[in-house]
Amino acid sequence: MSPRHAAGPAPGERAAVVTGLGLTTSLGGDVPSTWRALLDGGCGVERVDFGEPAGPAQVYLAAPAAVDPGTVLSSAKAAHCDRSAQFALVAAREAVRDAGFPDPSALAGDGSRVAVVVGVGLGGLTSVLEQDHRLRTQGAGRVSPRTIPVMLPNHAAAEVGLMVGAKAGVHAPVSACAAGAEALAQALGMIRDGRADIVVAGGTEAALHPLVLAGFARLRALSRRHDDPKGASRPFDADRDGFVMGEGAGMLVVESAAHAAARGARVHGRLTGAGITNDSHHVAQPAPGGPGCAAAVDAALRDAGLVPEQIQHVNAHATATPLGDLGEAQALHSVFAKGVDDVTVSATKGAFGHTLGAAGAIEAVLTVLALRDRTAPPACSLERVDPAIGLNVVGRDPAALPCGPLAAVSTSMGFGGHNVALAFADAS
């Protein structure tokens, strides 16, 4: 056993299981439709004109949600929430029901043992921009009184907390594109430390706005393959040239194993470890060689009491940027060394686009599903793996995972140098 991998959680720490899953993405408005479309090679990317009706066209590639969350929630609730919070509510409601609570408010009892953690990247930015436009064109008297609540980064978390009556803590990590994964790391800590029996955790984002898209374009982060929307985002591909933005949410019900067993809950999988690091290299570029990512994966494995040889699957962050994908691949080579070819790697952002603060949570749901169904999801747009990547990347068809106990890692990275890795195991 490598000395960098210890024995996992300390004696007496409580195990965490996943009892509920929720998704809303460009492939579907819930978990079954999204998972089915992903395994079938679906892609939610399209050309979208974000321009004003009377103004010039502002056409970008994007992966808008398949289902408008405002049509799922009550009209009153939708009117009082930013779109990012709407996504969070829709996905959280599905996750809570999937966990065996038909009425979300019945989850909490008196609420003292239930917590919520929802990560965001840009949060209510689009609502802020809408209100700024109203201020400039109609005057201060037309600005919504909800402007301040919906612009706060904790808006989505607060709305989910209200829905389930959480009183053990409502938190909102803001760590760019690693925020959804960091939310799950916090949830694991709360379960282990005994601060909560149930944590509704995940990430959400609704930032498809021309200002955001123009900003990423100026950073040269977006794919310029406008004539081929379905093939534009190509994680790990030799011809990758940037990502496509998406929107949506992923939410999980993370529960202490003892609490889940006591109520006879179905268990989808186990959240066994988390690692959080920072590159401290550059605000918008990964450190060469991916040392921060490697350290996060090492930390997650150590936290889970695993060695690299026990991992069969990785759901990679893989945004399809030339530097980002290469650095992540180098990090995985560093961790798994000679055994890297035995690890089946999925890169799914070609289907969903990059959902920023929601990405880590959406991909955590996919990782749990992959272990549950023993199926690694495909990369819908992959044509040829970059030889410099050198990973066993799943192509355009799903890949079967081996028999026996399964364990996986999901990686997330974000501007500011954030790195988060989560370790999962199957329900057995």
Residues of each region from the PLM?
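ACP-dependent fatty acid/polyketide chain-elongation machinery
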Residues: 1-77, 99, 120, 258-270, ...
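Phosphate/pyrophosphate-binding loops at sites that engage ATP/ADP/AMP, CoA/4′-phosphopantetheine
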Residues: 95-110, 260-267, 296-313, 335-339
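Conserved catalytic cysteine-centered active-site region
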Residues: 4, 8-13, 47-90, 96, ...
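Conserved small-residue
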Residues: 20, 38, 92, 116, ...
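Condensing-enzyme catalytic core mediating Claisen C-C bond formation in acyl metabolism
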Residues: 15-19, 43-46, 227-304, 312-313
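Acyl-CoA/ACP chain-elongation machinery
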Residues: 195-241, 274-288, 316-326, 342-392
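Flexible, low-complexity linker/loop segments at domain and module junctions
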Residues: 1-18, 104-111, 304-310, 341, ...
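Short, well-ordered amphipathic alpha-helical segments that serve as non-catalytic structural scaffolds
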Residues: 88-99, 156, 183, 256, ...
